[in-house]
């Protein structure tokens, strides 16, 4: 399966169904009155996090997703059915960003987590809502409210406990294959790994996930090589395993290059706990191993462990140290409260069902001087002094202007 870790898509929730204008027609009932039902709500756009996906490739060839419109109302006070939802299935670790990639709208980190991204539009009122003592046969019915729409970015950040970093050909994929059942591509040339790979390490009765990303080179944060695009996949890691190729002449410089790229990327990668290992020790003499371990320890300021992914030397001590950091990080993490299952981009021009109902009642009020209705930030005026219907929404500034005008009229 091809790997894709980001995709731009267009989503639209369904429009509300139209209200119905109808009248009761039955034998021996001369004046049945209105019985038009309301339209149904439009379908929602829902994100669902599933465990059996590890790529966003499904969104490469289809970028537009639209929920269904709500069903129209019918006679006999029948409310239209809700439109079908659009359910977008994404891998664990998917983030939702706005079109400019500046704001994270949602972060799905556990399988089974769902989130309503866009709500469907409300259905229109049927003529039953307009019945009053003075208008017993209204012929007015509303269209449904439009749904919401927007462009969004989906960005995948894999969920792993430990992340492998290092220069190309440092032996990261070989190490992953040696400690897990993952089978990444392994070859003797740079950038063999072109996308992240995950593997599960079993250590006694404990398990943790380790991620292998493409190698970094000097200037990766400026786009050199594959760049630092895949560093986002280790942002969630609790510890980093930094592998250094022991066959290089200057192992200290190799360490500093990668550390510089981690710091330049940001995201707190350079502040994460780190385990440093000198890899490919099977190709070195005992004196060379001792000398390079000393040079590397001075550069990183901590003990460096010898390792050979091919022969298996040093694997258990490294895994034990990684799990020690992982266990400490797990214990230190605060309990995360359950995320709200509902997320939506609110529309300022779309009042709630109760607000709309109050507005309709205000419009039918027979008060000669007009009637003001207020609910939170919504303020409506139903009729002007001539009794003509006015359908306007006012905010706080508009209300202050109206009050000032009334004071001026009173002074005159």
UniProtKB/Swiss-Prot annotation:
Pfam families: GTP1_OBG (PF01018), MMR_HSR1 (PF01926). Residues 1-159 form the Obg domain. Residues 160-327 form the OBG-type G domain. Mg(2+) binds at residues 173, 193. GO terms for biological process: ribosome biogenesis. Its cofactor is Mg(2+). GTP binds at residues 166-173, 191-195, 212-215, 279-282, 308-310. One of its GO terms (cellular component) is cytoplasm. CDD domains: Obg (cd01898). Its main location: cytoplasm. It is found in: Cytoplasm. InterPro entries: G_OBG, GTP-bd, GTP-bd_Obg/CgtA, GTP1-OBG_CS, GTP1_OBG_dom, GTP1_OBG_dom_sf, OBG_GTPase, P-loop_NTPase. Residues 335-412 are annotated as: Disordered. Its EC number is 3.6.5.-. Signal peptide: none annotated. It is an enzyme of class 3 (hydrolase). GO terms for molecular function: GTP binding; GTPase activity; magnesium ion binding. The keyword Hydrolase applies. Residues 385-412 have a biased composition (Acidic residues). Transmembrane segments: none annotated. It comes from the Bacteria. Belongs to the TRAFAC class OBG-HflX-like GTPase superfamily. OBG GTPase family. An essential GTPase which binds GTP, GDP and possibly (p)ppGpp with moderate affinity, with high nucleotide exchange rates and a fairly low GTP hydrolysis rate. Plays a role in control of the cell cycle, stress response, ribosome biogenesis and in those bacteria that undergo differentiation, in morphogenesis control. Monomer. HAMAP family: GTPase_Obg. This is GTPase Obg. The gene is obg.
């Amino acid at each position: 399966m091809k790997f894709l870790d980001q995709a731009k898509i267009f989503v639209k929730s369904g429009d509300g169904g139209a209200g119905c204008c109808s009248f009761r027609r039955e034998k021996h009932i001369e004046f049945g009155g209105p019985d038009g039902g309301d339209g149904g709500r439009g379908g929602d756009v829902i994100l669902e996090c599933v465990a059996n996906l590890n790529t966003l490739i499904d969104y490469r060839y289809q970028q537009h997703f639209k929920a269904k419109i709500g069903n129209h109302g019918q006679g006999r006070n029948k409310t239209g059915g809700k439109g079908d939802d659009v359910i977008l299935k994404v891998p664990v670790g998917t983030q939702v960003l706005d079109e400019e990639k500046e704001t994270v709208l949602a972060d799905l980190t556990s399988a089974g987590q769902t989130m309503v991204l866009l709500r469907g539009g409300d259905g229109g009122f049927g003529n039953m809502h307009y019945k009053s003592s003075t208008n017993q046969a209204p012929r007015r019915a509303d269209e449904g409210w439009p749904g919401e729409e927007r462009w969004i970015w989906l960005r995948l950040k894999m969920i792993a406990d430990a992340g492998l970093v290092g220069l190309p050909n440092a032996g990261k994929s070989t190490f992953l294959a040696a400690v897990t059942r993952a089978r990444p591509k392994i070859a003797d040339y740079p950038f063999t790994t072109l996308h992240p790979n995950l593997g599960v390490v079993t250590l006694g009765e404990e398990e943790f996930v380790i991620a292998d990303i493409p190698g970094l080179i000097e200037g990766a944060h400026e786009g050199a090589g594959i760049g630092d695009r895949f560093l986002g996949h280790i942002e969630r890691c609790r510890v980093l395993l930094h592998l250094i190729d022991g066959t290089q002449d200057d192992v200290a410089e190799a360490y500093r290059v990668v550390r510089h790229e981690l710091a330049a990327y940001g995201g707190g990668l350079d502040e994460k706990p780190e385990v440093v290992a000198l890899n490919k020790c099977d190709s070195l003499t005992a004196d060379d191993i001792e000398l390079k371990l000393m040079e590397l320890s001075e550069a990183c300021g901590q003990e460096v462990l010898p390792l050979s992914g091919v022969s298996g030397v040093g694997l258990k001590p490294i895994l034990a140290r990684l799990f020690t950091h992982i266990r400490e990080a797990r214990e230190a993490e605060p309990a995360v409260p359950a995320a709200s299952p509902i997320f939506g981009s609110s529309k300022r021009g779309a009042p709630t069902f109760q607000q709309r109902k109050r507005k309709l009642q205000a419009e039918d009020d027979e008060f000669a001087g007009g009637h003001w209705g207020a609910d939170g930030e919504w303020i409506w005026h139903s009729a002007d002094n001539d009794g003509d219907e006015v359908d306007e929404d006012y905010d706080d500034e508009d209300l202050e202007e109206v009050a000032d005008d009334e004071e001026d009229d009173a002074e005159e």
